[in-house]
């Protein structure tokens, strides 16, 4: 098998896998801010914990940069502190 073909196949596979993780992160972020806007602090805390795990895992696998994960989680904390 020619190397470029294999590389294309690997890239496509990684892209699909990483895209699903990034989509999940975006959805968790939206879910957090929706809960916060609705005034449901308990739900927002729960989603924040779920998001922390997901962001840390994605950063550990190199899907997103670790500084981006840290920045997002810090903003979640500040938003919660401002409301709570």
From Swiss-Prot:
Family label: Belongs to the bacterial ribosomal protein bS20 family.
Gene Ontology biological-process annotations: translation
Organism lineage: Bacteria, Bacillati, Actinomycetota, Rubrobacteria, Rubrobacterales
GO cellular component, one term: cytosol
Keyword vocabulary terms for this entry: Ribonucleoprotein, Ribosomal protein, RNA-binding, rRNA-binding
Gene: rpsT
Residue span of region Disordered: 1-22
The name this protein goes by in its record: Small ribosomal subunit protein bS20
NCBIfam families membership: S20
HAMAP family for the chain: Ribosomal_bS20 (MF_00500)
Position of the signal peptide: none
Function, as annotated: Binds directly to 16S ribosomal RNA.
Compositional bias segments (type: Basic residues): 9-22
Lineage top rank: taxon: Bacteria
Any matching Pfam family: Ribosomal_S20p
Transmembrane segment boundaries: none
NAD among keywords: no
Single Gene Ontology MF annotation: small ribosomal subunit rRNA binding
InterPro entries to which the protein is assigned, alphabetical: Ribosomal_bS20, Ribosomal_bS20_sf
């Amino acid at each position: 098998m020619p190397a470029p073909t294999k590389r294309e196949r690997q890239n496509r596979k990684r892209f699909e896998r990483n895209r699903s993780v990034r989509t999940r992160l975006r959805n968790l972020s939206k879910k957090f801010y929706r809960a916060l806007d609705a005034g449901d602090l308990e739900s927002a805390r729960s989603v924040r914990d779920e998001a922390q795990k997901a962001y840390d895992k994605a950063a550990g696998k190199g899907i997103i940069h670790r500084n981006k994960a840290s920045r997002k989680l810090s903003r979640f904390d500040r938003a919660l502190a401002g409301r709570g």
